[in-house]
């Protein structure tokens, strides 16, 4: 009986490990950490990580979105962030999804006053292409009310993740993992990184999705 119990526990451990591994394969989790106490190293080449590539959802150049749980004035901040990205990248347009359309980028606000001011969950298919993302934002985090400028800044950052970018290793980028509110603009580096992430559509102008396996980061 003792050996049987140990065997059952071992099988349970293997099952949990297997399920956890599957989750890591299916979902790419990005957590935005609010911090102003650390500074990325300036002793390395400036670069932005290229995380993911959109698949067939981007074939027409349009990504649909839906904003949930947002007050009207807060929703305007998110719309402004989406519009800003659209103005700064060629070949991608955002469209609010109607009730009959699938949502490519779901944007929701959490109200738990937790320790995450922004988070993007990217779901990929079996071929490794993005098929939808879920952006989580907050009005309050770390016991503090975030002002409108900060909420819009974080929205821009998370939308960058939704488009396929990882983090930048330098503070002058809106994709920096740390908060530098003075760097609130999209530069050529972010534009080029988005294009490289979705090269099949934005550079090659192809109708067939293809992963850009040769690019894991872009030097700025």
What are the residue ranges of the model-derived segments?
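N-terminal Lys/Arg-rich, disordered targeting/topogenic segments
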Residues: 1-7
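Disordered inhibitory propeptide/activation segment of secreted metzincin zinc metalloprotease zymogens
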Residues: 5, 12-74, 82, 121-126, ...
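Metalloprotease/metallohydrolase-associated module, dominated by Zn2+-dependent proteases
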Residues: 21-31, 125-150, 166-220
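Divalent metal-coordination and catalytic microenvironments
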Residues: 65, 85, 157-160, 175, ...
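Metzincin-family zinc-dependent endopeptidase catalytic domain
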Residues: 75-169
């Amino acid at each position: 009986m003792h050996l049987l119990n140990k065997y059952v526990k071992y099988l349970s451990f293997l099952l949990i490990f297997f399920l956890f591994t599957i989750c890591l394969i299916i979902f790419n989790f990005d957590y935005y950490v609010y911090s102003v106490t650390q500074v990325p190293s300036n002793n390395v080449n400036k670069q932005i990580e290229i995380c993911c590539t959109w698949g067939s959802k981007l074939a027409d150049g349009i990504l649909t979105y839906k904003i949930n749980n947002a007050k009207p004035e807060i929703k305007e901040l998110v719309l402004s962030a989406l519009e800003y990205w659209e103005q700064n990248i060629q070949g991608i347009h955002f469209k609010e999804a109607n009730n009959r359309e699938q949502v490519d980028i779901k944007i929701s606000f959490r109200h738990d006053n937790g320790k995450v001011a922004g988070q993007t969950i990217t779901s990929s298919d079996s071929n490794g292409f993005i098929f939808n993302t879920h952006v989580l934002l907050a009005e309050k985090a770390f016991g503090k009310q975030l002002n409108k400028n900060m909420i819009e800044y974080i929205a821009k950052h998370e939308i960058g993740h939704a488009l396929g970018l990882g983090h930048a290793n330098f503070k002058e980028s809106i994709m920096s993992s740390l908060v530098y509110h003075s760097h609130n603009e999209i530069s050529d580096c972010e534009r080029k990184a988005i294009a490289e992430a979705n090269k099949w559509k934005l550079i090659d102008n192809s109708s067939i999705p293809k992963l850009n396996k040769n690019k894991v980061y872009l030097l700025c």
